[in-house]
Amino acid sequence: EYSHLFMAISGKLSAVICINDPLRKEAKYVISNLRECGIKKIVMMTGDSEKTAKSIASKVGVDEYYSEVLPEDKANFVKSEKLKGRKVIMIGDGINDSPAISESDVGIAMSEGAEIAREISDITISADNLNNLIVLKQISNKLMKRVDLSSKFIIGFNLGLILLGVGGFVRPSTSAFLHNASTVGISLNSMTNLLENTNTYNYH
């Protein structure tokens, strides 16, 4: 589970430095909930060793993992997934993640990460709380649902007004009033909160 740095002096191994980057306690919970929100495939790509990557992947429950990858490898992976017709979200915080973030459909960077990653990303979130990823997906799902329902209502309502007008059941002035009233109603509904609560999460 450790990344190893080897130090040599005069061509001879003098020390091995073991580095452990603790796993975020909410990581497994976040990945599980992203699946519940509709994310079908979650992949981890890291420059760490195979042993370290395998250990982390098994703990958090990703679908696939790739170890010892270079920045161009990450970018090429994103390109290949897009060629398969998939929408790709890339999350990263380092310079090495920047090419892949740039190639993705939606790039998400950590606010405490490299400046270049933040500049080219579409969204920046705080690294203090990975639960923000769940909130983003929930907002996306709710927004798309609201847009879909609003569009269907507007089309259906206006079509009904047209048919009633053609049939002579509704006067033009009444039809115009109802049309404007429905527009105001849809606008007011669009201003309501998409999520009731985004602050409470239970993970172990």
Residue map of PLM features:
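ABC-family ATPase nucleotide-binding domain "signature/switch" substructure
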Residues: A109
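Cytosolic catalytic headpiece
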Residues: E1-N96, S102-V106, Q138-N141, T200-H204
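Membrane-embedded alpha-helical bundles of multi-pass transporters
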Residues: G38-I39, V60, E64, N96-D97, ...
